[in-house]
Amino acid sequence: TRPASFELAVRIPSFAAGATVNGETAKPGEIFRIEKEWRDGETVDVALTFEAKLVPAANGMFTLQRGALYFALPLAAQSFAWEYERSGIRRKAPYCDYKIFPQEAWGYAFAGDTFHVIERPVGAYPFSREEPPVQIEADLAQIEWDALPGQPGVCAETPASLVPTALRRRALQPYGCTTLRMTVLPALPVTKV
C-alpha cells in the first residue's frame, strides 16, 4: 500500500478531564489535528482521563458524573408481575408489566466530595447489575426521605430532612446498570479540616 497524505481530525469530548493523542496533550472540547503522510499499519493512540464530580441538578441536588456516564445508587428491589388485558391484547408474564418496590431505604445524601473509582474488565453483558464494569465509592449520609402520600415506594421530590443519621460508604454504578436507583441526591456541606 502506498503512503497517503491527509489530515486526521480527532474530536476530544468536553466531558474528559484530560487527553493525549500519540502522547501529545490535547484539550477537551476541541479538535486535535494530525496532518502527515500516513503509512500502512500506523495507529493513533487516544487516551482520555475522567474525573468523578458532583453536577448540579434540580431542587439544589446533585448527580455523580464521570465522563459521559451518570452514576446511581442501586437499591435492593422486589418486582411483581402485573398481568392484564387491554384493547384485546393479553399481557401475561413474562411479557407483561412489572411493579418494582424498594426493599431498602433510599434516603441518602452525598457526604463528601472525594470518590474512589473501581474499574473492572467489561464482561459479556456490559450493563450488568451484579458486575458493572465501573463503580464509584462515595461517602453517603442516611437522611429522612419520605414516600409520596398514598404511594408507598415512590419517594418525595425532596427529602424531609438533611440531618444525617448515619454515614456509609456505598458503591454507585452507571445508571444503565441499575433497575431501581437513586440518581439525584442532596449534598451535605463539606467541612475541610
Model regions: which residues?
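Surface-exposed beta-strand/loop patches in extracellular or lumenal glycoproteins
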Residues: 4-13
